[in-house]
Amino acid sequence: MKIGKLNSIVMVLFFDLLVACSIGLVERTNAALESSSKDLKNKILKIKKEATGKGVLFEAFTGLKTGSKVTSGGLALREAKVQAIVETGKFLKIIEEEALKLKETGNSGQFLAMFDLMLEVVESLEDVGIIGLKARVLEESKNNPINTAERLLAAKAQIENQLKVVKEKQNIENGGEKKNNKSKKKK
């Protein structure tokens, strides 16, 4: 009888230790992601400040127009957008790594918290003229709630795809010269 009680006590202590380690891991992961998110938002503000120093007038942006047609400093603005996209990509990679770690043991609250951090970061991109991304991601998440690692990674991929389109529009690789993509009709 004493051995049975001893085994029960050992099992309870082992389970408590396992839960404590799991909670500690979640708290460390959450703190690391929040810190990374805050660092990224600060980098985006720094990028904006540097672009302002190069002549970009962010105040000229309208609700829908955030390009060089509504403000000065076209190349500096495009470079700022690309820098912000590159930095955001690094953050999204961290999110992916953490989601994969929690894939089997994570709960819906953890994935939703990671999604909220991604939304905060996406919203901060509006400071450099990358707008509308948050609304598109939120719209998609209404149909597919972010409660699993797979759905979180799908939302991350959606953000990356949309940022890729914005980055390509900046046309930085070609010396910053924007070209008119409208083809002329032959008569």
Curated annotation (Swiss-Prot):
The keyword Translocase does not apply. It comes from the Bacteria. The keyword Signal applies. Keywords: Plasmid, Signal. Residues 1-20 form the signal peptide. Pfam families: Decorin_bind (PF02352). InterPro entries: Decorin-bd, Decorin-Binding, Decorin-db_sf. Coiled coil: none annotated. Binds to decorin which may mediate the adherence of B.burgdorferi to collagen fibers in skin and other tissues. Belongs to the decorin-binding protein family. This is Decorin-binding protein B. It comes from Borreliella burgdorferi (strain N40) (Borrelia burgdorferi). The lineage of its organism: Bacteria, Pseudomonadati, Spirochaetota, Spirochaetia, Spirochaetales.
